[in-house]
């Protein structure tokens, strides 16, 4: 296997909170997949949940070398936890097509948050 890309992102949690205060659920609707949306709606820390998902998706877009453009959207990158609680990525739509085109066979996700920040790193392998 070879590393195709590496992306890292850091999000100020207060910034996400500010956007939610101004625009309600619009940011969450744009960023989250349907499965993530269902979790967010009942999560005990919805702002922190959204900030962490946003960081992973930005990191993934950077790892793919594309950013969020040309048909790619945040909600095409879905963060979920495996049976051990490890964060993983599931792709949909154009993100999945891009991964198939690039020959992606594995994606590694690491995620951390502290009081003020959430950060994530994504590595993609072929």
UniProtKB/Swiss-Prot annotation:
This protein's record includes keyword Lipid biosynthesis: yes
Entry keyword Chloroplast: no
InterPro entries the record matches: 4-PPantetheinyl_Trfase_dom, 4-PPantetheinyl_Trfase_dom_sf, ACPS, Ppantetheine-prot_Trfase_dom
One Pfam family, short name: ACPS
A cellular-component GO term for this protein: cytoplasm
Entry's localization field: Cytoplasm
Reactions catalysed, as given in the entry: apo-[ACP] + CoA = holo-[ACP] + adenosine 3',5'-bisphosphate + H(+)
Keywords: Cytoplasm, Fatty acid biosynthesis, Fatty acid metabolism, Lipid biosynthesis, Lipid metabolism, Magnesium, Metal-binding, Transferase
Primary subcellular site in the record, as a coarse category: cytoplasm
EC number: 2.7.8.7
Binding of Mg(2+), residues: 9, 58
GO molecular-function terms, A-Z: holo-[acyl-carrier-protein] synthase activity; magnesium ion binding
GO BP term, pick one: fatty acid biosynthetic process
UniProt family annotation: Belongs to the P-Pant transferase superfamily. AcpS family.
Task performed by this protein: Transfers the 4'-phosphopantetheine moiety from coenzyme A to a Ser of acyl-carrier-protein.
The protein's name in its UniProt record: Holo-[acyl-carrier-protein] synthase
Biological source species: Escherichia coli (strain SMS-3-5 / SECEC)
Lineage, broadest ranks: Bacteria, Pseudomonadati, Pseudomonadota, Gammaproteobacteria, Enterobacterales
């Amino acid at each position: 296997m070879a590393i195709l890309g590496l992306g890292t992102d850091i999000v100020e949690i207060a910034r996400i909170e500010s956007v939610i205060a101004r625009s309600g659920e619009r940011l969450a609707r744009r960023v989250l997949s349907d499965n993530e949306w269902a979790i967010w709606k009942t999560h005990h820390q919805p702002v922190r949940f959204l900030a962490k998902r946003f960081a992973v998706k930005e990191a993934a877009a950077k790892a793919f070398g594309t950013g969020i453009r040309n048909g790619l959207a945040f909600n095409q990158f879905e963060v979920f936890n495996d049976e051990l609680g490890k964060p993983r990525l599931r792709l949909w739509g154009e993100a999945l097509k891009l991964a198939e085109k690039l020959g992606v066979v594995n994606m590694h996700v690491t995620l951390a948050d502290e009081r003020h920040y959430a950060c994530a790193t994504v590595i993609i392998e072929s």
